[in-house]
Amino acid sequence: MDKIVIHGGNRLKGEVRISGAKNSALPLLFATLLAPGQHQLENVPALRDISTAGKLLSILGAEVHSQEGVFSVDATRIRSVEAPYDLVRTMRASVLVLGPLLARLGHARVSLPGGCAIGARPINLHLKGLEAMGAEIDLDHGYVEARAKRLHGANIYLDIPTVGGTENLLMAACLAQGTTVIENAACEPEIVDLATALTCMGARIEGAGTDRIVVEGVDELQPLHYAVMPDRIEAGTFMVAAAMTRGDVRLLGARQADLEALISKLQEAGVTISAEDHALRVRGPRRIAPVDIKTQPHPGFPTDMQAQFMALMSIADGTSVVTESVFENRFMHVCELQRLGADIAIEGKTAKVRGVKELLGAPVMATDLRASASLVLAGLAAENTTEVSRIYHLDRGYERLEEKFRNLGAHIERIKG
């Protein structure tokens, strides 16, 4: 099994190109199921989850080709409506084929999802919304089976602003008959990116990026030609890395508007951040000030940056409080950070982080995608050598991470196992 070995203590300096956003690329790939013809997506990151999505599209009958960040998908001949367990169990985003298959073909059979083990994250809100649009849904031996002659518009209220649920219902509504209104919709930038792409295909959508999205269904959509937005979580991870190493890093392609909550908290911690031409420049402080955060749906502080920010606070000059309000069971990285010398105490959904003067390298084990990133960041700032195992989690969400850090001056390498 591969591991990453880090000899910490180097200041990060230079430029890094931010990859396309995984959390945008996945729904965009599955949106190709909505229309026959040749689709093309650019700026697609080379990640394990993206590869899984390509395999799933191929199983369904699409012709998929990829080369250097460009995906070509011909979704003309969809032969199957089943997303099998063997694929879906490795990536919960696979459930996003449910809405497109049901809307275009009137039938979908999708295994219940897997992915990171950070809480239940049920898909009941997806199913409740599709039922409101006229779908008949059965749960059978771990599969969701959905049927509808044609979906119809509906007024849907989401009990929580689920990103995946909003995406699934948004895609399904594009081919539904009549008007669909999604209330308490997720507002994440990836929702806006999906809606923009669907509009390019001929969909009629208003309100994406707000908590009320209105979709006027159309009879058919056209093939998609689109470039995936930059990954705000990757950008945020490099911002924290620069802060932890007292670095000076330019993030090429990073968009300030997608990162306002994180930028605000980093500046509160003493980090200097400036917008430049299609880039953000991040300069770490000599002293990191303690900052309290509470994760919230967008535009609040992103839960996908909680673990990385906790790593930063572990070397702050004082005590901070981290509250996780989006997912349960998302403090699994704490035990591993403690192995590096972090002083963290958990009480329910809150972690009290007492900053220490320095972290010391040690063998640690990744437990999920963002936890693995936090351990790499801690290793970059720690004295001596840190080994991070189970990095297959990391490969689900970061493209060539160790190479990018190495180009910024980090002493980091991947050891094949």
Swiss-Prot record:
The record's Pfam families line, in alphabetical order, gives: EPSP_synthase
**Which family is annotated?**
Belongs to the EPSP synthase family. MurA subfamily.
Which function does this protein serve? Cell wall formation. Adds enolpyruvyl to UDP-N-acetylglucosamine.
Give the residues annotated as active site: C116
Looking at the UniProt record for this protein, which Gene Ontology cellular component terms does it annotate, in alphabetical order?
cytoplasm
Q: Where does phosphoenolpyruvate bind?
A: K22, N23
Functional pathway: Cell wall biogenesis; peptidoglycan biosynthesis
Subcellular location as annotated:
Cytoplasm
Annotated CDD domains: UdpNAET
Record's protein name: UDP-N-acetylglucosamine 1-carboxyvinyltransferase
Q: Which UniProt keywords apply?
A: Cell cycle, Cell division, Cell shape, Cell wall biogenesis/degradation, Cytoplasm, Peptidoglycan synthesis, Pyruvate, Transferase
BP-aspect Gene Ontology terms:
cell division; cell wall organization; peptidoglycan biosynthetic process; regulation of cell shape; UDP-N-acetylgalactosamine biosynthetic process
The organism named in the record is Syntrophotalea carbinolica (strain DSM 2380 / NBRC 103641 / GraBd1)
Q: Which residues bind UDP-N-acetyl-alpha-D-glucosamine?
A: R92, D304, V326
Which residues are reported to carry the modification 2-(S-cysteinyl)pyruvic acid O-phosphothioketal?
Answer: C116
Reaction(s) this enzyme catalyzes, per UniProt:
phosphoenolpyruvate + UDP-N-acetyl-alpha-D-glucosamine = UDP-N-acetyl-3-O-(1-carboxyvinyl)-alpha-D-glucosamine + phosphate
Cited InterPro entries: Enolpyruvate_Tfrase_dom, Enolpyruvate_Tfrase_sf, MurA_subfamily, RNA3'P_cycl/enolpyr_Trfase_a/b, UDP_GlcNAc_COvinyl_MurA
